[in-house]
Amino acid sequence: MTVLKMTDLDLKGKRVLIREDLNVPVKDGVVKSDARILASLPTIKLALEKGAAVMVCSHLGRPTEGEYSEENSLKPVADYLSGALGREVPLLGEYLDGVKVEPGQVVLFENVRFNKGEKKNADELAQRYAALCDVFVMDAFGTAHRAEGSTHGVARFAKVACAGPLLAAELEALGKALDNPQRPMAAIVAGSKVSTKLDVLNSLSQVCDQLIVGGGIANTFLAAAGYKVGKSLYEADLVDTAKAIAAKVSVPLPVDVVVAKAFAESAEATVKAIDEVADDDMILDIGPQTAAQFAELLKSSRTILWNGPVGVFEFDQFGNGTKVLAEAIAASPAFSIAGGGDTLAAIDKYGVGEKISYISTGGGAFLEFVEGKVLPAVAVLEERAR
């Protein structure tokens, strides 16, 4: 994968437009989770150090296109950036007809989704973005799977289009895990439905040595192996699909599980052997014996890709499986990459973030890359680098 990188460019005196993913949760005008903003700071700081006039843009939420809405304004993000950078970061509402930014200055453009044509990737809007800058930097891996005006269109028309450090690091880490992984490779894919992760499971079954499944996905694989899953969430129509995947790659199944009679925070947890699941049981986590076996697998792996918690970890009595696996990944010498919103929440909860080689900032983009799909915003950077 060959793309031009911002780190290789001379930006002195240049007008640089950086597309970041600053789509963060905001409540009552205050940023509630700053992870994406923190991830973008090194890129913004580097552009300033290189002497660029810096313009930053992003979307936030899903406003009605072409209409301003206060709840989707980037004002709280501008305030946060001002504090984080130790300088005022003005929020510009009107910018499509040109802005005055001096080298060493940084401004934030208001939500790109307030602009008509953003989601449809309209050429006219993309050309207006491109006219604002000498160099366009795509740094938002989290939106790289969407062909929109500020992620894809602008890269077609800008004088120079390159990948920012955050995007470049994501592509490098994912490439390392998927293109030429050190063996043995283990993948953990968990979630409520096989149907939503079918492409991920199929793709990983061709690259990994061990495919650990969890959540509702594991229940479908258990049913495929002839076990009773009681009232657990599973997809009867995908049992044959699960069998086909299990025929291609080693899918270790739980030997014990944690069950409850109801899906509730107050539900009583009971550990049962896999062949003792009753008709009115719901499987809500892997059991301690299974967690220990899977942990050993992970500790002996050299590449680990993790997407999804293996139990309902939001309820502590069903969180042990995810906790044990998270700690095993952290203790493993493997190159480990983790992605997906629930996975990041689990990493935070169990405090293992420092020990995971790479934590992806992209949810949908992470999954599409793992599926082997082309990310439009990356493809256009490759075209421009030719």
Curated annotation (Swiss-Prot):
Q: What is its EC number?
A: 2.7.2.3
Query: Main localization of the protein?
Result: cytoplasm
**Record localization:** Cytoplasm
Give the metabolic or biological pathway.
Carbohydrate degradation; glycolysis; pyruvate from D-glyceraldehyde 3-phosphate: step 2/5
Task: State if Kinase is listed as a keyword.
Answer: yes
Per the record, what are the reactions this protein catalyses? (2R)-3-phosphoglycerate + ATP = (2R)-3-phospho-glyceroyl phosphate + ADP
Entry-linked Gene3D superfamilies: Phosphoglycerate kinase, N-terminal domain
What are the record's GO terms for cellular component? Answer: cytosol
Q: Which UniProt keywords apply?
A: ATP-binding, Cytoplasm, Glycolysis, Kinase, Nucleotide-binding, Transferase
User: Is this entry keyworded Nucleotide-binding?
Assistant: yes
| Residues that bind ATP | K197, E314, G340, G341, D342, T343
The molecular function GO annotations come to: ADP binding; ATP binding; phosphoglycerate kinase activity
Q: Which PANTHER family match?
A: PHOSPHOGLYCERATE KINASE (PTHR11406), PHOSPHOGLYCERATE KINASE 1, CHLOROPLASTIC-RELATED (PTHR11406:SF23)
Subunit organization: Monomer.
What HAMAP family is this protein classified in? Answer: Phosphoglyc_kinase
Under which name does UniProt file this protein?
A: Phosphoglycerate kinase
Native source organism of the sequence: Azotobacter vinelandii (strain DJ / ATCC BAA-1303)
Upper classification of the organism: Bacteria, Pseudomonadati, Pseudomonadota, Gammaproteobacteria, Pseudomonadales
